[in-house]
Amino acid sequence: MNKDQQLAHHILDAVGGIDNVDNIIHCMTRVRLKINNETQVDYPKLKNIEGVLGVIQDERLQIVVGPGTVNEVSAEMVKLSGVQLGEDIPHRSNTSNIKNQAQQNKREFQQKRKQSKMNTILKSIANIFIPLIPAFIGAGLIGGIAAVLNNFITAGTISADWVKQLVAVLNVIKDGMLAYLAIFTGFNAAKVFGATPGLGGVIGGTTLLTGITEDNPIKNVFTGEPLIAGQGGIIGVILAVWLLSIIEKKLHKIVPNAIDIIVTPTISLLIIGLLTIFFFMPIAGFISDGLVGVVNWVIGVGGIFSGFIIGAFFLPLVMLGLHHIFTPIHIELINQSGATYLLPIAAMAGAGQVGAALALWVRCKNNTTLRTAIKGALPVGFLGIGEPLIYGVTLPLGRPFITACLGGGIGGAVIGGIGHIGATAIGPSGISLLPLIAHQKYLGYIIGLLSAYLAGFIFTYFFGTTKEMRNLNKLGD
């Protein structure tokens, strides 16, 4: 049994065993467990397991273990559960326990009452896009490599025909994700809203207006102008699939079982398909145009001030899980402007974390527990994966989290002051974002990164530590 498999067993032991887990999923850094009985979870024990970088209590219990490790840990848990990743785990011990089920239903009802509509919306957005993040990263970096090679070709540094062919091939691979993002979004949105995923994918594909030409366009019913493929972007897709889920569920209730498989999907697609083309695409197009205009105005006019605010407050948004609201905004910015000028500023938040961690490493030489945590979390922090540093280092200590935010604010102010530094895709951050910087503004982005590193280091070195942190061999209070 390797180290990651052992970690999976230790985590399961702390949460009450596999019999106390109803469902297992994961994202880039977190194992997300749906717990049957929260009273059986030993949180102090869970947080002190070597390899656990943080624990977040939410609708699902989220255990931060870091990139790469999360795949191995989740795979071992799934192996022990006997089901596939994401499937509900059957439990022989409680299938007939009506009392436990009633208590669970009561907890879920109370939890739903506590959740605001905004929290529900944010969680839905997160659940739609989190599974797509690896594809965003892979396709984005491949597109970045193609862009760098194309710049060399344009500059005359490279002229070989095979390089031109390679650039074309890399762009085809990149567009396998980005060109059909509406379909992927529709598919995932259907899963989140409880509709048939395939139908959601079809609705997403409808927005691409396949087969429509300039000679025979579909007119916008509100303006009379021709609709443009992808108009309304993913905002329109999400709204349309949400309505699809309502229509499909209603039809399942009223259509006889004998013809349900034929009638329900046909009527659902016909109704929502027409509404998507003639209503959702124009309306969502208006919304997305306004949203993009506002964001570009805030960044363009606010400059240094806007950059500081975004860079400084992005980490608290990540901590609260509210940062996912920016995902559709990034995508709309890329669709309309060719780049998102918001992402490089937000990326400075992670750079401030890196600077803070380096300062803690230097200042807290006697705190081997803290230095061990930094050693494990810092390398991926440079690459833009900040959760291990947030939940494993700065947030438990308190004060360094604040100084890291200030460092991110300085980096954001620098990016905002330079201006027009955008990214052509989303997903990566930190150094990993460098190949995706638009219009060859690499130097400006590097200056911003270095500024955030330095500011995070200075703020934390002078104001972010206490005597206890420096001398005691522990992490947090």
UniProtKB/Swiss-Prot annotation:
UniProt catalytic activity: N-acetyl-beta-D-muramate-(1->4)-N-acetyl-D-glucosamine(out) + N(pros)-phospho-L-histidyl-[protein] = 6-phospho-N-acetyl-beta-D-muramate-(1->4)-N-acetyl-D-glucosamine(in) + L-histidyl-[protein]
Which portions of the chain have biased composition (kind: Polar residues)? Answer: 92-104
Q: Where is this region: Disordered?
A: 91-113
Q: Where is the PTS EIIB type-1 domain?
A: 5-87
Annotated membrane-spanning segments are 128-148, 167-187, 192-212, 227-247, 267-287, 298-318, 342-362, 377-397, 401-421, 443-463
Q: What is known of its domains?
A: The EIIB domain is phosphorylated by phospho-EIIA on a cysteinyl or histidyl residue, depending on the transported sugar. Then, it transfers the phosphoryl group to the sugar substrate concomitantly with the sugar uptake processed by the EIIC domain. The EIIC domain forms the PTS system translocation channel and contains the specific substrate-binding site.
Name of the protein in question = PTS system MurNAc-GlcNAc-specific EIIBC component
Provide the species name.
Answer: Staphylococcus haemolyticus (strain JCSC1435)
